[in-house]
From Swiss-Prot:
The gene is nuoN1. Belongs to the complex I subunit 2 family. GO terms for molecular function: NADH dehydrogenase (ubiquinone) activity; NADH:ubiquinone reductase (non-electrogenic) activity; quinone binding. It is a multi-pass membrane protein. NDH-1 shuttles electrons from NADH, via FMN and iron-sulfur (Fe-S) centers, to quinones in the respiratory chain. The immediate electron acceptor for the enzyme in this species is believed to be ubiquinone. Couples the redox reaction to proton translocation (for every two electrons transferred, four hydrogen ions are translocated across the cytoplasmic membrane), and thus conserves the redox energy in a proton gradient. GO terms for cellular component: plasma membrane. Keywords: Cell inner membrane, Cell membrane, Membrane, NAD, Quinone, Translocase, Transmembrane, Transmembrane helix, Transport, Ubiquinone. It is found in: Cell inner membrane. Coiled coil: none annotated. It catalyses: a quinone + NADH + 5 H(+)(in) = a quinol + NAD(+) + 4 H(+)(out). This is NADH-quinone oxidoreductase subunit N 1. Its EC number is 7.1.1.-. The chain crosses the membrane at residues 6-26, 33-53, 71-91, 99-119, 121-141, 156-176, 193-212, 244-264, 265-285, 299-319, 321-341, 364-384, 388-408, 438-458.
């Protein structure tokens, strides 16, 4: 019976998605709003089921749940709920109000839940592909828009390449370790030097495939184009739930089956983290589109989170999880502001379009300013604490130079975040924006409240992240 309750959230998401798909297909009326609302309820129920699911390993080591997977799954569900709440008015305004949108989000989240809890390379790949197939369609969801079609094609081609590299890496690991089970791989690498050397080669390909999905440099080339070309409601989803799911998987893979060869991959992760922070900071400086700016910003944020992985300690994992949770809130708040940027029901995406917003719409300007300050890491906002925890973990693990580089790139990145604030408060511009929907206002308000008030009660998030990190790092986790 415990096995049933463990997989119940996945069954619930998949069955709910199929029911909504059938209801949309076999009814003549447009039920897109009702299906979107129902999807939000389904995700909330699924999050509750995921928290209540018993821990342990099932299906002969193919699937595992613990405090770490619960933490990541809840973040994924919250990201999807926020993205759906932001999508309703935006999709209607640009003419893509279709019931398939929330259904695809549900199927993508189903894949992410499988992904996060995978304890076998085969399960990992299945979850990876379930997620990817839904995301490919979402990227090109505005099929009559040239930029959206281009974004979908780029994401599909490069995503297929990353999947191929991942699968090739899995085959190499299986060839040298003789198993695809996480516990079996860890045992093989700890006891057989030859297997460790050969499997490390496969690990490089696995790491490349996963780095692509989180937009880590130098595998980031798709991110600015897809962020700009895809509908903003899709971009808001891409920037949150998929990145958290894949990053959680990355933590499990690197510190679980490949934990015994930490010394062989730590330098590579440091290089990827450093490259991501530098490219994210420098690449955004000359951007005029706020969506492309957010694309480069996400590259940098993944670099900071990778510092926690490079530390290879429980404190590093906890710091990375705290950073991801805060990044989730900041991203939803920022994309809520971007979705609210519309005049005459037409989206505006240039940073220059924000000119004069402080006088025309002071509440909007305040929320976006809070998000920008937080992403820049200015105390006492939540973004500062996210960086503080990963920097502290890196320094304690002997990665001082990487932490110093992180501080330098944070200063550089502050330039383009503050430029957005400068445009809103000091430049003259056009009349104000359209009236915001209740869903967008709710997401913006909740994100701003969390970002500002986090300093007064950080213990809840830090305690949960510490429990999750402990579950990942203990020997019984694998």
């Amino acid at each position: 019976m415990s096995t049933f309750y463990t997989v119940l959230p996945i069954l619930f998401l998949a069955i709910a998605g199929m029911i909504m798909l059938m209801s949309g297909v076999f009814t003549d009326r447009d039920h897109s709003f009702a299906i979107t609302a129902a999807s939000i309820v389904v995700l909330a129920i699924a999050a509750r089921l995921l928290v209540a699911a018993p821990g342990g390993t099932i299906f002969h080591g193919l699937y595992q749940t613990n405090d770490f997977t619960r933490f990541a799954d809840v973040l994924v569900a919250l990201g999807a709920i926020g993205a759906l709440a932001l999508s309703v008015t935006f999709n209607r305004n640009i003419g893509i109000t279709r019931f398939e949108f929330p259904v695809l989000v549900l199927f993508a989240v189903t894949g992410m839940v499988v992904l996060v809890s995978a304890s076998d390379l085969i399960t990992l790949y299945i979850g990876f592909e379930i997620q990817s197939l839904a995301l490919y369609v979402l990227a090109a969801f505005a099929r009559h828009n040239l930029r959206s079609s281009e974004a979908g094609l780029k994401y599909f081609v490069l995503g297929a390449l990353s999947s191929g590299l991942l699968l090739y890496g899995i085959s190499l690991v299986y060839g040298f370790a003789g198993t695809t089970n996480f516990a079996g791989i860890a045992h093989a690498l700890a006891g057989h030097p030859t297997a460790a050397v050969g499997s490390t080669i496969g690990l490089v390909f696995v790491l490349v495939g996963l780095a692509f999905k989180i937009s880590a440099a130098p595998f980031h080339m798709w991110t600015p184009d897809v962020y700009e070309g895809a509908p903003t409601s899709v971009t808001a989803f891409f920037a949150t739930a998929p990145k958290i799911a894949v990053f959680a998987l990355l933590l499990r893979v690197m510190l679980g089956p490949f934990g015994p060869v930490l010394g062989q991959w730590r330098d590579l992760v440091q290089i990827i983290a450093a490259a991501s922070m530098v490219i994210g900071a420098i690449g955004a400086i000359r951007q005029t589109s706020i969506k492309r700016l957010m694309g480069y910003s996400s590259i940098g944020h993944m670099g900071y989170a990778l510092m926690g992985l490079a530390a290879g300690t429980a404190a590093g994992v906890s710091g990375a999880l705290i950073y991801l949770a805060i990044y989730l809130v900041m991203s939803l708040g920022t994309f809520g502001c971007i979705i609210a940027m519309s005049r005459g029901r037409q989206p505006v995406e240039r940073i220059a379009d924000l000119a004069g917003m402080a006088s025309d719409d002071p509440r909007f300007a305040f929320v976006l300013a809070v998000m920008m300050w937080s992403m820049a890491g200015i105390p006492p906002l939540a973004g500062f604490f996210g960086k503080f925890y990963v920097f502290a973990a890196a320094i304690n693990a002997g990665l001082g130079p990487l932490a110093v580089l992180g501080i330098i790139t944070s200063v550089i990145a502050a330039f383009y975040y503050l430029r957005v604030i400068k445009v809103m408060y000091f430049d003259a511009g056009e009349p104000g924006l359209d009236r915001r929907s209740a869903g967008v206002s709710l997401v913006m308000g909740a994100a701003a409240a969390f970002t500002v008030l986090f300093v007064f009660h950080p213990s809840t998030l830090t305690t949960l992240s510490t429990m999750a990190a402990h579950a990942l790092m203990t020997s019984q986790g694998f």
